[in-house]
């Protein structure tokens, strides 16, 4: 699963997801892509599940690019813990995704195969997505 090798700070604020994505919203590498239509935190497990599903379906043919990286730590407090005594410990990593962001790209395969592979990956995502073709 994806996670940063090292970070400057162990914990982060939750932040807000306002507006649309202005970065990473164009197809750069492949010919087909999966675009997010809603804002969400996508965990490293979900990213990996989508990548595996696409790889399995496409088999040897084609190439896959993962265009998002989980760089935000999410902290969780132990269950049945009283309030106070600081912030919880980092549990998992998420990628902050805004509408319009490209999640995955594929190339070197036919459109039918790409559409099916990307739809399988889309079912693993916690948000509504859209299949897009470059050009």
Swiss-Prot record:
NCBIfam families associated with the record: rplP_bact
Complex and partners: Part of the 50S ribosomal subunit.
Q: Which UniProt keywords apply?
A: Chloroplast, Plastid, Ribonucleoprotein, Ribosomal protein
Biological processes per GO annotation: mitochondrial translation
Q: Name one GO molecular function term.
A: rRNA binding
| One GO term describing the cellular component | chloroplast
Q: Where in the cell is it found?
A: Plastid, Chloroplast
Tell me what this protein is called. Large ribosomal subunit protein uL16c
Q: Which cysteines bridge via disulfide bonds?
A: none
UniProt keyword annotation of Metal-binding present:
no
SUPFAM superfamilies xrefs = Ribosomal protein L16p/L10e (SSF54686)
UniProt lists the family membership as follows: Belongs to the universal ribosomal protein uL16 family.
């Amino acid at each position: 699963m994806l996670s940063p090798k090292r970070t400057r700070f162990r914990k982060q604020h939750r932040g807000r997801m306002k507006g649309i994505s202005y970065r990473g919203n164009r197809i750069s590498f492949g010919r087909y892509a999966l675009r997010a239509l809603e804002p969400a935190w996508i965990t490293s497990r979900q990213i990996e599940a989508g990548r595996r599903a696409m790889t399995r379906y496409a088999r040897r043919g084609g190439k896959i690019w993962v265009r998002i990286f989980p760089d935000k730590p999410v902290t969780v407090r132990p269950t049945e813990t009283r309030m106070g005594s600081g912030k919880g410990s980092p549990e998992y990593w998420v990628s902050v995704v805004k509408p319009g962001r490209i999640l995955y790209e594929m190339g070197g395969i036919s459109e039918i195969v790409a559409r099916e592979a990307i739809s399988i990956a889309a079912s693993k995502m916690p948000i509504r997505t859209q299949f897009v073709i470059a050009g």
